[in-house]
């Protein structure tokens, strides 16, 4: 019972009698020199993995291999961020090397991806039909949350904070279409089409570059066109949140939602 109370109060550590000197020494060392120990271990671990990552970058030939590289580099960026590490420059160099090599990979394969939609990686216009519609078709109530300008490393930072309320059963990456600008990529997600296809099939929903109107004003209408094309008759809700204060207002409405598909666009992250 005493141990449970101590753990519940988030104590740093505890010793159980009878205590020998080595236990006391280990406990003191862990707390007095914790930062130095963690830093040394992190530096050593990254140094050992450096050559493996370089080899991954040099030999990557599939989108799956590049996704694995992104996960690995992001993991190390987050681990080294909290230590005064001599490895920062090495990691920055490795990230730059990966970015340059990935750009060449995309230039080499991008046209082929467009010409072969059945075998290409999942792209912006494929997200809903690949990941969202199947869940709704199975009877799941789905909240599809799109966070603008939200990077993978930012997701990995907030993921542990959400673990109190949510369990991540599966984590997938997809490949954005080019250009990755919101006005193209996000419209492609909701329409399930490339920007050129949107312009040709739904010219009344396409907003040209020289027009002052926001280029993403028709997302809900584009979503409806995709539902119609795939003969999805279920109801849906759509919310676009442009400021953080509005979040509290719409979260109160979520409990009463009966629609199987609920779309939320968070459009203010880059303003924080």
Question: What is the predicted function of each stretch?
Answer:
Residues 19-28:
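C-terminal output helix
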């Amino acid at each position: 019972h005493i141990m449970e109370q101590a753990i519940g109060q988030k104590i740093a550590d505890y010793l159980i009698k009878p205590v020998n000197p080595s236990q006391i020494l280990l406990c003191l060392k862990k707390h007095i020199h914790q930062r130095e120990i963690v830093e040394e271990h992190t530096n050593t671990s990254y140094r050992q993995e450096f050559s493996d990552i370089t080899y991954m970058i040099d030999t990557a030939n599939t989108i799956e291999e590049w996704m694995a590289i992104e996960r690995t580099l992001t993991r190390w960026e987050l681990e080294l961020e909290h230590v005064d590490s001599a490895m920062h420059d090495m990691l920055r160099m490795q990230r730059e090397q990966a970015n340059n090599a990935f750009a060449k990979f995309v230039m080499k394969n991008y046209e082929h991806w467009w010409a072969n939609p059945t075998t290409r990686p999942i792209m912006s216009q494929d997200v809903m039909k690949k990941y969202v519609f199947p869940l709704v078709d199975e009877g799941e109530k789905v909240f599809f949350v799109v966070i603008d300008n939200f990077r993978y490393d930012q997701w990995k930072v907030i993921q542990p904070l959400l673990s109190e309320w949510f369990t991540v059963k599966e984590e997938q990456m997809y490949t954005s279409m080019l250009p990755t600008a919101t006005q193209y990529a996000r419209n492609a997600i909701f329409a399930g089409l490339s920007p050129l296809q949107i312009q040709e099939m739904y010219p009344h929903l396409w907003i040209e570059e020289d027009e002052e109107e926001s280029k993403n004003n028709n997302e809900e209408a584009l979503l409806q066109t995709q539902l119609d094309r795939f003969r999805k008759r279920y109801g849906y809700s759509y919310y676009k949140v442009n400021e953080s204060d509005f979040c509290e207002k719409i979260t109160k409405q979520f409990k009463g939602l009966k629609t199987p598909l609920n779309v939320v666009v968070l459009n203010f992250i880059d303003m924080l």
